[in-house]
Structure formats: structure tokens, C-alpha cells
Regions:
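A conserved mid-domain beta-alpha-beta active-site/ligand-binding segment of alpha/beta enzyme cores
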Residues: 58-150
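Cytosolic-side membrane-insertion boundary helix
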Residues: 149-159
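A transmembrane-helix-recognition feature enriched in membrane-embedded lipid enzymes
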Residues: 157-197
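Short, well-ordered, mixed-charge alpha-helical segments that flank or form enzyme active sites
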Residues: 28-32, 57-62
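Residue-level signal for alpha-helical context at structural boundaries
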Residues: 38, 55, 114, 194, ...
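Helix-loop-strand module that forms the ligand-binding subsite of alpha/beta enzymes
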Residues: 1-48, 52
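Sequence-level detector for tyrosine residue identity
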Residues: 28, 54, 166-169, 185, ...
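Membrane-proximal, acidic/low-complexity disordered segments on the non-cytosolic side
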Residues: 189-213
Length: 213
């Protein structure tokens, strides 16, 4: 839906030379999508001044289970009375008014350029290392599977079979493979890469343009 709007000629004309603040609502993965949104807004001539993500802050595996419960039942409740309530927490929803107030103050003081930095300094935007690690690799894996399914279909393969295979792969990857990979990562890689990781967390938490070359 967001991409459809961003491609609309009337919308692109509307945001040209216009300050824009993006709001995100997701389970926990949003950085790849936001990179696309940033590029589209820049292409439209918009001035991205801020980005506020609202996510499920629960454990990745737990939130996958609770979100599934919410999707299949339509009930945003504690599964079996023991799991956390799925989705964006009531506390974060309540906190949204503070984000709005900060935006108003920034506009009134003509300091909208510092809006995002203020959000970060107040620790209102948090990007867990686990999510950063998973999402960066998930994009590559998705592209591999997308190309595989497309190529198999072009050669007369059964698309439904390969899509179902991908579905089961996702379940195995989420609940079996990722915990093992993350454990290895935090033991052997993370301690020696903290500076680079912090730079990446700052980049994705901010509204910076990726430098090329």
C-alpha cells in the first residue's frame, strides 16, 4: 500500500519540497522497507525530517507466535493467559502523543531538522541488535528464494510447490535455525564488531542517506 502511494503522481507532486515525517507500524522488522521509502521520497523531492517506528518489542520468537494468534483469531489478547499481548504495546501507543508534541514544538521553533536526533537522544527509537542482524540477512535470503521460485516457474515448475517449500523453510529458519545462528553470532562475532554495529544502528535509527563510493 505504501509503495502504491509513493508511486502515485499526485502524491509525488504533493510531497515535492515538503517536509515529511514517516510513521511505521510493524511486528519488528522495518529497516529494509524504510530504506525503500527513503529512496522514493528523495526521488519525489520530499524532505524527510523524521521517522517513528512503532513495533512489537517482545522477543522475536515469542512475538511471531503471538502475532499469529492475533491474526488467526482477531483477538489481541494474551494467548493461554501467559504470553504477552501481541503488537505495539499500550505504553508505546500512549507514548505517541509525546512524539506528536515534540513534532509540534519542533515546527513552532523551526527546528524540525533536529526532530529525529531528539527522538534518538530521548531513546524513543530502539533497534535491537538481533533484529538488525536478522533483517539484513533475511532480505538476501528472500531475494534468493524469489529468484529460485521465479526461475522454477519459468521452466515449467510447480509454483505452488516451491512457495509451500519456502513457507516451511521460513518456519524452520525462524524457530530452529535463527536461535542457533544468533547464539554463534553473539559469541564469536558481536564482541569484535560492536563499533560497526553501533554505526549501523545509528544509521537505521536516523534518516540519513546511505553514502556510496
Amino acid at each position: 500500500m505504501a509503495m502504491a502511494v509513493l508511486q502515485d503522481a499526485r502524491f509525488r507532486q504533493l510531497v515535492q519540497n515538503t517536509p515529511v515525517i514517516t510513521l511505521i507500524g510493524s511486528r519488528n522488522m522495518w529497516i529494509n522497507a524504510q530504506e525503500v521509502v527513503k529512496r522514493e521520497l528523495a526521488a519525489a523531492g520530499a524532505k524527510l525530517m523524521g521517522n517513528v517506528p512503532y513495533v512489537d518489542r517482545g522477543n522475536n520468537l515469542v512475538s511471531a507466535f503471538t502475532i499469529l494468534h492475533w491474526m488467526l483469531t482477531g483477538k489481541k489478547t494474551k494467548k493461554w493467559g501467559i504470553f504477552p499481548i501481541p503488537g505495539v504495546s499500550a505504553k508505546d501507543i500512549e507514548q505517541a502523543k509525546n512524539h506528536g508534541q515534540l513534532c509540534v514544538e519542533s515546527l513552532e521553533k523551526n527546528q524540525l531538522a533536529s526532530f529525529q536526533e531528539e527522538l534518538i537522544s530521548r531513546k524513543w527509537i530502539q533497534l535491537p541488535v538481533t533484529i538488525l542482524f536478522i533483517e539484513k540477512r533475511a532480505k538476501r535470503l528472500f531475494q534468493i528464494w524469489a529468484n529460485l521460485i521465479t526461475n522454477k516457474e519459468k521452466k515449467g515448475g510447480n509454483r505452488r510447490f516451491w512457495v509451500n517449500l519456502y513457507k516451511y523453510y521460513l518456519i524452520i529458519a525462524l524457530f530452529l535455525i535463527s536461535p542457533i545462528v544468533l547464539t554463534i553470532y553473539f559469541i564469536f562475532v558481536f564482541p569484535f564488531s560492536m563499533k560497526k554495529i553501533e554505526q549501523e544502528r545509528y544509521y537505521y535509527s536516523n534518516i540519513l542517506e546511505r553514502k556510496h563510493g
